[in-house]
């Protein structure tokens, strides 16, 4: 009898640990973009401009990836090959420096422009968030679970989306 009680107690403890009741925030959007790189910011911005709700997930504290991380020299060769939102970015850089376009820039200028895309797009950015779990139905991702990059034992966030884009 004592053995049965002990087993039931252990099962109860293990089952409560396995389904620990972490505080969870649930967010539902049309498009979830994972990675706050240049591509990630522009993907979320474009989704919003096309009438879709979007959220951007960034593991760190800064947007823009290499573009805002110190790689501020564009060596495309033929600047006429650049179009669309990329051209818009370089023209915004140019405006900062009092020029029409600018292909060499400081990291803080690039980051400021990416933050402006976020503001103009009106989408949320979750900083310090990393992937904990992916949930699928068949081959399709239906939601992801995020944890705080600096405090993994804290609150988790569930993102439910119709589309997931990896820009990490």
Regions found by a protein language model. Give the residues of each.
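Conserved beta-strand-loop-beta-strand element in the redox core of flavoprotein oxidoreductases
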Residues: 135-158
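Beta1/beta-strand and adjacent pyrophosphate-binding region of the FAD-binding site
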Residues: 25-37
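Bacterial N-terminal signal peptides
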Residues: 7-17
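Boundary at the C-terminal end of the N-terminal hydrophobic targeting segment
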Residues: 20-23
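N-terminal Rossmann-fold NAD(P) dinucleotide-binding loop
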Residues: 40
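Conserved N-terminal/central alpha/beta ligand/cofactor-binding core
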Residues: 46, 52-53, 58-140
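Core beta-strand elements of the Rossmann-like FAD/NAD(P) dinucleotide-binding domain
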Residues: 27-29, 152-163
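Hydrophobic or amphipathic alpha-helical targeting/insertion segments
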Residues: 54, 61-65, 158-168
């Amino acid at each position: 009898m004592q053995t049965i009680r002990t087993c039931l107690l252990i099962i109860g403890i293990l089952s409560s640990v396995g389904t620990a009741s972490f505080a969870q925030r649930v967010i539902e959007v049309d498009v979830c973009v994972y990675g706050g790189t240049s591509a990630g910011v522009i993907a979320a911005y474009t989704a919003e401009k096309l009438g879709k709700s979007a959220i951007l997930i960034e593991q760190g504290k800064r947007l823009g990836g290499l573009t805002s991380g110190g790689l501020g020299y564009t060596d495309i060769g033929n600047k006429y090959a650049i179009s669309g939102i990329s051209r818009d970015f370089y023209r915004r850089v140019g405006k900062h420096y009092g020029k029409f376009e600018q292909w060499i820039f400081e990291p803080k200028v690039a980051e400021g422009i990416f933050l402006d895309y976020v503001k103009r797009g009106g989408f949320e950015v979750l900083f310090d968030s990393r992937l904990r779990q992916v949930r699928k139905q068949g081959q399709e991702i239906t939601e992801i679970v995020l944890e705080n990059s600096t405090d993994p034992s804290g609150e988790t966030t569930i993102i439910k989306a119709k589309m997931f884009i990896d820009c990490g």
